[in-house]
Amino acid sequence: MWWFSRNILYSVSLLIGLALAGCTLEPLYKSGSETADFLQNIKLDAPKDRDSYVLYNRLAERLDGGHGTRYLLSITPRKSEARAGIAADGRAQRKIVTGFADYSIVQIADGKEVQSGSVKAFTGYAQSASNVAILAASNDAYDRLMIQLADKILDALILIQAQP
Protein backbone atom coordinates (compact mmCIF):
# COMPACT_ATOMS: atom_id res chain seq x y z
CA MET A 1 0.00 0.00 0.00
CA TRP A 2 2.85 2.40 0.78
CA TRP A 3 4.19 1.76 -2.72
CA PHE A 4 0.94 3.06 -4.24
CA SER A 5 0.93 6.34 -2.26
CA ARG A 6 4.62 6.88 -3.01
CA ASN A 7 3.94 6.54 -6.75
CA ILE A 8 1.13 9.06 -6.52
CA LEU A 9 3.46 11.51 -4.77
CA TYR A 10 6.09 11.08 -7.49
CA SER A 11 3.48 11.49 -10.22
CA VAL A 12 2.12 14.70 -8.73
CA SER A 13 5.65 16.06 -8.29
CA LEU A 14 6.45 15.25 -11.91
CA LEU A 15 3.29 16.98 -13.15
CA ILE A 16 4.02 20.11 -11.11
CA GLY A 17 7.59 20.15 -12.45
CA LEU A 18 6.38 19.85 -16.04
CA ALA A 19 3.82 22.60 -15.52
CA LEU A 20 6.46 24.96 -14.15
CA ALA A 21 8.87 24.12 -16.95
CA GLY A 22 6.27 25.17 -19.49
CA CYS A 23 5.59 28.61 -18.04
CA THR A 24 7.18 31.72 -19.52
CA LEU A 25 9.28 32.94 -16.62
CA GLU A 26 12.33 34.93 -17.66
CA PRO A 27 15.30 36.18 -15.67
CA LEU A 28 14.81 39.70 -14.34
CA TYR A 29 18.27 40.86 -15.37
CA LYS A 30 18.16 39.24 -18.81
CA SER A 31 20.19 41.21 -21.32
CA GLY A 32 17.90 43.49 -23.30
CA SER A 33 15.07 43.47 -20.75
CA GLU A 34 13.54 46.74 -19.55
CA THR A 35 14.95 46.18 -16.07
CA ALA A 36 18.47 45.56 -17.35
CA ASP A 37 18.29 48.65 -19.59
CA PHE A 38 17.06 50.79 -16.70
CA LEU A 39 19.79 49.57 -14.35
CA GLN A 40 22.49 50.12 -16.99
CA ASN A 41 21.49 53.78 -17.24
CA ILE A 42 22.14 54.58 -13.57
CA LYS A 43 25.33 56.31 -12.47
CA LEU A 44 26.33 56.16 -8.81
CA ASP A 45 27.34 59.23 -6.84
CA ALA A 46 30.94 58.99 -5.57
CA PRO A 47 31.42 57.32 -2.14
CA LYS A 48 32.42 59.61 0.73
CA ASP A 49 33.59 57.21 3.45
CA ARG A 50 34.33 53.53 4.12
CA ASP A 51 30.69 52.54 4.57
CA SER A 52 29.65 54.37 1.40
CA TYR A 53 32.47 52.64 -0.44
CA VAL A 54 31.22 49.15 0.54
CA LEU A 55 27.66 50.12 -0.42
CA TYR A 56 28.90 51.65 -3.70
CA ASN A 57 30.86 48.51 -4.63
CA ARG A 58 27.87 46.25 -4.02
CA LEU A 59 25.63 48.42 -6.19
CA ALA A 60 28.31 48.79 -8.87
CA GLU A 61 28.21 45.01 -9.35
CA ARG A 62 24.61 45.33 -10.56
CA LEU A 63 24.48 48.80 -12.08
CA ASP A 64 26.48 49.41 -15.23
CA GLY A 65 26.32 53.20 -15.54
CA GLY A 66 28.59 53.06 -18.56
CA HIS A 67 26.96 53.99 -21.83
CA GLY A 68 24.31 56.68 -22.02
CA THR A 69 23.63 57.16 -18.32
CA ARG A 70 20.36 58.99 -17.77
CA TYR A 71 20.02 58.80 -13.98
CA LEU A 72 22.16 59.67 -10.97
CA LEU A 73 21.73 57.71 -7.75
CA SER A 74 22.75 59.51 -4.56
CA ILE A 75 22.87 57.59 -1.28
CA THR A 76 23.42 58.80 2.27
CA PRO A 77 24.01 55.93 4.72
CA ARG A 78 23.51 56.38 8.46
CA LYS A 79 24.12 53.91 11.25
CA SER A 80 23.67 53.49 14.96
CA GLU A 81 24.94 50.98 17.47
CA ALA A 82 23.20 49.62 20.57
CA ARG A 83 24.38 47.32 23.31
CA ALA A 84 22.72 43.93 23.64
CA GLY A 85 23.53 40.97 25.81
CA ILE A 86 24.87 42.82 28.85
CA ALA A 87 27.16 40.82 31.18
CA ALA A 88 26.93 40.97 34.98
CA ASP A 89 29.83 43.44 35.12
CA GLY A 90 28.04 45.81 32.72
CA ARG A 91 30.07 45.02 29.59
CA ALA A 92 28.21 44.54 26.34
CA GLN A 93 28.67 41.02 25.02
CA ARG A 94 26.95 41.81 21.76
CA LYS A 95 26.26 44.93 19.72
CA ILE A 96 23.36 45.50 17.37
CA VAL A 97 24.09 47.76 14.41
CA THR A 98 21.16 49.43 12.66
CA GLY A 99 21.62 51.15 9.34
CA PHE A 100 19.52 53.45 7.22
CA ALA A 101 20.20 54.61 3.68
CA ASP A 102 18.38 57.55 2.17
CA TYR A 103 18.50 57.37 -1.61
CA SER A 104 17.46 59.66 -4.41
CA ILE A 105 17.47 58.98 -8.13
CA VAL A 106 17.33 61.98 -10.46
CA GLN A 107 17.34 62.41 -14.21
CA ILE A 108 20.69 63.84 -15.25
CA ALA A 109 19.25 65.82 -18.18
CA ASP A 110 16.81 67.98 -16.23
CA GLY A 111 17.55 67.26 -12.55
CA LYS A 112 14.01 65.98 -11.98
CA GLU A 113 13.75 63.54 -9.09
CA VAL A 114 12.38 60.20 -10.22
CA GLN A 115 12.18 58.58 -6.80
CA SER A 116 13.53 58.92 -3.30
CA GLY A 117 13.19 56.77 -0.26
CA SER A 118 14.86 55.16 2.69
CA VAL A 119 15.76 51.58 3.51
CA LYS A 120 16.65 50.00 6.83
CA ALA A 121 18.66 46.93 7.85
CA PHE A 122 20.34 45.58 10.95
CA THR A 123 23.00 43.13 11.97
CA GLY A 124 25.06 42.35 15.05
CA TYR A 125 28.42 41.23 16.27
CA ALA A 126 29.88 39.67 19.39
CA GLN A 127 32.16 41.56 21.75
CA SER A 128 35.10 39.47 22.93
CA ALA A 129 38.05 40.09 25.20
CA SER A 130 40.43 40.90 22.35
CA ASN A 131 40.40 44.42 20.92
CA VAL A 132 41.62 43.12 17.56
CA ALA A 133 38.76 40.60 17.41
CA ILE A 134 36.25 43.29 18.35
CA LEU A 135 37.55 45.59 15.59
CA ALA A 136 37.45 42.78 13.01
CA ALA A 137 33.92 41.75 14.05
CA SER A 138 32.78 45.38 13.99
CA ASN A 139 34.18 46.00 10.50
CA ASP A 140 32.61 42.78 9.24
CA ALA A 141 29.23 43.73 10.73
CA TYR A 142 29.32 47.17 9.09
CA ASP A 143 30.26 45.60 5.76
CA ARG A 144 27.34 43.15 6.03
CA LEU A 145 25.04 46.03 6.94
CA MET A 146 26.04 48.07 3.89
CA ILE A 147 25.59 45.04 1.62
CA GLN A 148 22.07 44.53 3.02
CA LEU A 149 21.25 48.20 2.45
CA ALA A 150 22.61 48.05 -1.12
CA ASP A 151 20.49 44.99 -1.89
CA LYS A 152 17.39 46.72 -0.53
CA ILE A 153 18.11 49.83 -2.60
CA LEU A 154 18.50 47.67 -5.70
CA ASP A 155 15.13 46.04 -4.94
CA ALA A 156 13.57 49.50 -4.64
CA LEU A 157 15.08 50.55 -7.98
CA ILE A 158 13.65 47.48 -9.68
CA LEU A 159 10.23 48.31 -8.23
CA ILE A 160 10.51 51.89 -9.53
CA GLN A 161 11.14 50.55 -13.00
CA ALA A 162 8.24 48.10 -12.73
CA GLN A 163 5.71 50.85 -11.98
CA PRO A 164 3.75 52.15 -14.99
Language-model segment annotations:
Residues G66-L72, T76-S118, F122-D140, I147, ...:
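Surface-exposed short loop/turn segments
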Residues L18-G22:
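C-terminal motif of bacterial Sec signal peptides marking the signal peptidase cleavage site
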Residues G32-Y56:
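Post-signal peptide N-terminal segment of mature Sec-exported envelope proteins
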Residues T24-P27:
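Bacterial signal peptide processing site
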Residues Y56, D64-H67:
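Extracytoplasmic
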Residues M1-V12:
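Bacterial N-terminal signal peptides that target proteins for export
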Residues A60, D64, A150, L154-A162:
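Sec-exported extracytoplasmic/periplasmic mature domains
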